[in-house]
């Protein structure tokens, strides 16, 4: 779904990974938890700033992991939350929206995804 057209002239800056609600979401990178919160489009979100300042964005979560704290360091593979359909995904099946942003903008995150 990377690059697909969205409403209001937007493009899809990520990939959607469909999974049952509550499926654990693991970080694809080591780094600092830079954001835990909520926004209109992404719903419940977690942001991690990885090496080189690359920002990893995890959205539509049911909830973040209980022990996750902003400004804390995590390793790749750490539990960061659980699949849901929050934000503008309320009418869709549960899924994780995963986006990656460099200083130049959004990049296709698909190559960074791997099975644990």
Which residues does each predicted region cover?
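Surface-exposed, glycine-biased beta-strand/turn segments
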Residues: 1-44, 75-76, 85, 107-110
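Conserved, short, structured surface segments that act as functional micro-motifs
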Residues: 45-49, 72-116
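Non-catalytic surface loops within mature trypsin-like serine protease
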Residues: 19-21, 62-63, 102, 115
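A generic structural signal for solvent-exposed, polar alpha-helical segments
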Residues: 8, 63-66, 103-104
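Zn2+-dependent peptidoglycan hydrolase active-site motif and core
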Residues: 27-69, 92-97
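Short alpha-helical segments in extracytoplasmic peptidoglycan/chitin-binding modules
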Residues: 6, 58, 80
